[in-house]
Amino acid sequence: MKRVLSTSLSVALATGLYGISFGAIGVAAGLDVLSVMLLSLLMFSGASQFAFVGVVSAGGAPITAIASAWLMGVRNSFYALRLAPEFGPRGLMRFLQAQLTIDESNAVSAAQVGSSDRKLGFWLTGIGVFTFWNLATLLGAIGGNLIGSVEAWGLDAAAAAAFLGLLWPRLRENLPLAFAGGIVALAAVPFLPAGLPILLAAAVALLPIGRKK
């Protein structure tokens, strides 16, 4: 139990602190503190949140931002399929587990041996990340407001940079597909509203380009 607790706490703290970046970047994208906090409280998926503010900062339509966030968060559904048979949540616990089903809680849970440790790892990590992430988001959002002009500090480009940072490890796994998506997105920029090119690039990811057989 001590090992699970230690692992969960360290993962939760390290991941949660990254929320400072999201808070500051969300404000830089033009959102107010309340909107930034609602994203962390309700959406609670780092990649999806960065995708959302990335589209917003580029001037994209809200529906495009929502679609981008959904595409980034769809993997959590597959985590839920793995966890549901063992956890078997009912009632309100089902909604709580769904909210806490993220990369970190799934990873810590999967690394444990016994069923009780897997459940403990999931809940401790999920609750820990949720707590630290939201506290850090608040600090980042308030700090972003105190900075003043985000353009003067170069933070207006931070959302796109953070989004790319999240994607880069996966892009390296299939460079031909990444380049194809990039070319499609760049070609679409002059003709489509902001935010739609990235959705076209995501569609390219479904093509069998450069995949290992």
Describe these PLM feature segments:
Residues 119-203, 207:
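Membrane-embedded alpha-helical modules
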Residues 210-213:
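Membrane-interface capping segments at transmembrane-helix boundaries
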Residues 1-3:
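Short, Lys/Arg-rich, polar N-terminal cytosolic tail immediately upstream
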Residues 66-156:
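Helix-loop-helix junctions within the multi-pass membrane cores of secondary transporters/permeases
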Residues 6-98, 116, 197:
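Pore-lining transmembrane helices
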Residues 5-16, 37, 126, 130, ...:
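Entry/N-cap segments of selected transmembrane alpha helices
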